[in-house]
A protein has these predicted regions:
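Conserved beta-loop-beta element that borders a ligand/cofactor-binding pocket
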Residues: 137-164
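Amphipathic terminal alpha-helices
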Residues: 294-332
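Glycine-rich Rossmann NAD(P)(H)-binding loop
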Residues: 161, 188-193, 221-228, 237-239, ...
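Active-site "gating" loop of Rossmann-like NAD(P)-dependent oxidoreductase/epimerase domains
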Residues: 101-127, 138, 142-147
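Mid/C-terminal beta-alpha module of Rossmann-like enzyme folds, strongest
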Residues: 209-268, 329-332
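Substrate-positioning beta->alpha
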Residues: 167-175, 188-211, 218-219
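N-terminal Rossmann NAD(P)H-binding glycine-rich loop of SDR-like oxidoreductase domains
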Residues: 3-23
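Conserved C-terminal active-site "lid" loop/helix of NAD(P)H-dependent oxidoreductases
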Residues: 200, 258-290, 309-312
Length: 332
């Protein structure tokens, strides 16, 4: 099949591109910037379409010669993006897969684990990131119902490969570097809530089975590991992977976390202090033999090893460091 990835070499999508190539698909990547300083090298088998996806007319012209069996969009973040995607691809693809987020599930303290039919947030009661994903989903569902737009919605959980999952901070190398420099690692709340930490290679193994699958049209799926770990456990695994023996950890009280001036919106921070666990029945009906195979210990080692392959991979963000330092000083 001819498959287009919009994006295609990011933290989640690189492995999806790789898996699609391994399955024998003819893979195209649409992107305006092919720099790979903090990303993995683009697989040589992928064919490149260079265009600024945010420029509708430019992208329309770039795609004019093509038709696809499936389009996988990893960089659709708001309703305008969704509306443009519908216009661009409604006559160009047999399937369009939108990468949403499990953060759209309303945290109601009941009905765990979450299923695809769990209540979703209203777009106006949450931060822009979550609200915009909700708006996108609604736009695609409406297009499916009114125009038969061939939508499949996929909601990843916390998924990592080239990023480092931390409870408080950002997904760059700033927090690991602080720990290596002897600074404490911050954990939101008590750190005992159950969470899913999914390696991108495992996500991709399920995701690629949705490509070209007619049973997935008009459906939504979340994809996460079946293994649940706490942030305390994950944080200790990170410190072990960094070979830090003199571990320093500070737990920031629940109410205080929501007041912190950090890059992550407060409602996403709130979700990181709650149980985030998911029922995988629906994806396993499509991919019956799938299960996540990479443990957090193996996955973190793979990530840290890759980060140390090049200095460019290890982004240290001064603004993040300053904000984390201010929080740390308050609780030391």
């Amino acid at each position: 099949m001819k498959v287009l990835f919009v994006g295609g070499y990011g933290n989640i999508s690189w492995w999806c591109t790789k898996r699609a190539i391994e399955k024998g698909h003819e893979v195209y990547l649409l992107n305006r910037d092919l720099k790979t300083g903090t990303r993995k090298e683009i697989p040589s088998e992928a064919k490149i379409i260079v265009s600024d996806y945010r420029n509708f007319e430019e992208t329309k012209d770039a795609l004019e010669p093509y038709e696809f069996d499936c389009v996988c969009d990893f960089i659709c973040f708001n309703k305008e993006h969704a509306t443009n995607a519908i216009k661009l691809f409604k006559d160009k693809t047999k399937q369009y897969i939108f990468i949403s987020s499990e953060s759209v599930y309303k945290r109601t303290f009941k009905g765990l684990p979450y299923t695809e039919s769990s209540e979703k947030y209203n777009e106006d009661e949450v931060s822009d990131y979550i609200g915009d994903k909700v708006r996108c989903e609604k736009a695609f569902i409406e297009a499916f119902e009114k125009e038969n737009f061939p939508i499949t919605i996929v909601r990843p959980g916390l998924t990592y490969d080239t990023i480092v999952p931390v409870s408080i901070g950002h997904n760059c190398f700033t927090i690991p570097q602080r720990c290596l420099d002897g600074k404490p690692l911050l954990i939101a709340g008590e750190g005992n809530a159950l969470y899913t930490f999914t390696h991108s290679s495992d996500f991709a193994s399920a995701f690629v089975e949705l490509i070209g699958n007619k049973k997935a049209i008009g459906e939504d799926f979340h994809i996460t590991t079946q293994t649940w770990r706490t942030w305390n456990e994950a944080s200790n695994v990170l410190l072990d992977t960094l070979k830090i023996t003199n571990k320093k950890i500070i737990h920031i009280p629940f109410d205080e976390v929501l007041k912190l001036d950090l890059p992550m919106p407060s409602d996403l921070m709130y979700q990181r202090m709650l149980h985030n666990i998911f029922d995988l029945t629906k994806i396993r009906k499509i991919v019956p033999n799938w299960e996540a195979k990479v443990s957090i210990e193996e996955g973190y080692k793979m990530t840290i090893d890759w980060l140390y392959e090049s200095d460019k991979h290890r982004r240290f963000v001064d603004n993040v460091n300053q904000k984390i330092e201010a929080v740390t000083n308050k609780y030391i």
